[in-house]
């Protein structure tokens, strides 16, 4: 199962979410702005200063940001 770590307002997250939906791919989305456990897992996956969107496939990070761009997640 694909997992998308994102925020509702990040334009890069919106782009990845819309592409996954357009491609009719199943995924679970975690909003790291409101879900502390998801934010902690995101940090485990990509480090202390994570950038979203992060796409995880089969337990492995397959994408961070979009073409090197993304939105940084605060300490929340």
Report residues per predicted region:
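Residues that form or flank phosphate/diphosphate-binding pockets in enzymes
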Residues: 14, 37, 64-65
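Local sequence-structure signature of Cys/Sec-based thiol-disulfide redox active-site neighborhoods
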Residues: 1-26
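Non-catalytic, surface beta->alpha helical segment in thiol-disulfide oxidoreductase systems
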Residues: 57-76
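Structural micro-motif
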Residues: 46-56
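Glycine-/small-residue-rich active-site loops that bind phosphorylated ligands and cofactors
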Residues: 11, 34, 62
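Thioredoxin-like thiol-disulfide oxidoreductase module
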Residues: 32-48
């Amino acid at each position: 199962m694909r997992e998308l770590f994102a925020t509702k307002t990040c334009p890069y997250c919106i782009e990845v979410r819309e592409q996954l939906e357009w491609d009719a791919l199943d995924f679970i989305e975690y909003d790291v702005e409101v879900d502390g456990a998801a934010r902690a897992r995101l940090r485990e996956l990509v480090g202390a200063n994570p950038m979203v969107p992060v796409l995880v496939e089969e337990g492995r990070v397959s994408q961070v940001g979009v073409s090197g761009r993304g939105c940084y997640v605060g300490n929340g």
